[in-house]
């Protein structure tokens, strides 16, 4: 079975041509994660999300799947008035995320919850203006159900 990309490679290349790191620290976190083969946002996805967040200006963001905290740090940087809540099931990754949010100087606006999002997401109180699910793809529907109730 031949798996084709979601977007045309020419479109991806075009979008990548607009990519610029948001800060030197975020660039360092990206490079380190990529070197360690830890998945972070693709550059074209980051460009799209930065545009979307700039237009929407959410004040509360939920992320499922923190990994090293790159996306959460990016979201907090793009949206300086927002509070980001992120859920990570892996203790080591949650620790890395905590360290990286400190490095990015956004830890005061990011809450990292350690646990399985299928269990913890429904326990979080409040309404989120923006939700980003970036965890185990096979559980996306369960994460969605936990988030929207």
Each language-model region and where it sits:
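A short alpha-helical cap/connector motif
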Residues: 1-130, 137-149
């Amino acid at each position: 079975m031949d798996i084709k990309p979601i977007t045309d490679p020419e479109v991806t290349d075009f979008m990548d041509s607009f990519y610029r790191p948001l800060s030197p620290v975020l660039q360092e976190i990206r490079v380190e994660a990529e070197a360690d083969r830890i998945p972070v946002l693709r550059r074209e996805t980051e460009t799209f999300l930065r545009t979307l967040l700039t237009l929407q200006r959410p004040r509360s963001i939920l992320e499922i799947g923190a990994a090293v905290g790159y996306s959460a740090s990016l979201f907090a940087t793009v949206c300086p008035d927002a509070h980001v809540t992120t859920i990570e099931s892996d203790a080591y990754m949650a620790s890395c995320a905590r360290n990286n949010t400190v490095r990015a100087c956004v830890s005061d606006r990011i809450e990292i919850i350690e646990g399985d999002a299928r269990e913890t997401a429904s326990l979080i109180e409040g309404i989120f203006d923006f939700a980003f699910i970036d965890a185990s793809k096979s559980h996306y529907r369960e994460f969605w159900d936990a988030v929207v109730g």
